[in-house]
């Protein structure tokens, strides 16, 4: 379990507790009495296959600042849990589209950029209710155009964004 706090350098891990999960609920005595931080991330370090969900405070922090999450592996776990949440119909597909457009511009991992933008395209084109699809596609195209404009010229990120934009 990674504990993250907002700092001048972004969302940084300030504590880590190894825990074995057994059953539907597991007490974590090592965290009792410690101050609540901005993000509590289960499966931090991606040590096992697990469907992870966020508590409300962690979710709100990451929705408004996934790009501030300093650790690339923690970001990958976070991107994955948001995708799982869409596939399990726990969050709306347009939320993942918005999150991708807001957070992917500062992502440095090309695999993450490729995966997240592909997932945003799936959300916009297939997972969206038919009556919302046109607006979602317009939002995605407009957002991708902005990301393309802001990307470093000739970079891998620019190429990935361009490929996503043209489908």
Which residues are covered by each model-predicted region?
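Non-catalytic accessory/interaction domains
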Residues: 1-167
């Amino acid at each position: 379990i990674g504990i993250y706090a907002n700092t001048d350098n972004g969302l940084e891990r300030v504590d880590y507790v190894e825990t074995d999960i057994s059953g539907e609920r597991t007490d974590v005595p090592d965290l009792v009495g410690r101050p609540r931080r901005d993000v509590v991330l289960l499966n931090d370090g991606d040590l096992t296959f697990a469907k992870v969900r966020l508590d409300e405070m962690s979710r709100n922090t990451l929705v408004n600042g996934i790009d501030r999450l300093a650790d690339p592996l923690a970001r990958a776990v976070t991107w994955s849990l948001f995708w799982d949440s869409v596939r399990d119909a726990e969050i709306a597909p347009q939320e993942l589209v918005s999150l991708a457009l807001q957070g992917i511009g500062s992502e440095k991992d090309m695999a993450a950029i490729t995966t997240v933008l592909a997932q945003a395209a799936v959300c916009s084109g297939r997972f969206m209710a038919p009556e919302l699809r046109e607006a979602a596609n317009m939002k995605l195209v407009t957002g991708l155009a902005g990301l393309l404009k802001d990307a470093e010229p000739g970079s891998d990120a620019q190429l990935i964004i361009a490929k996503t934009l043209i489908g």
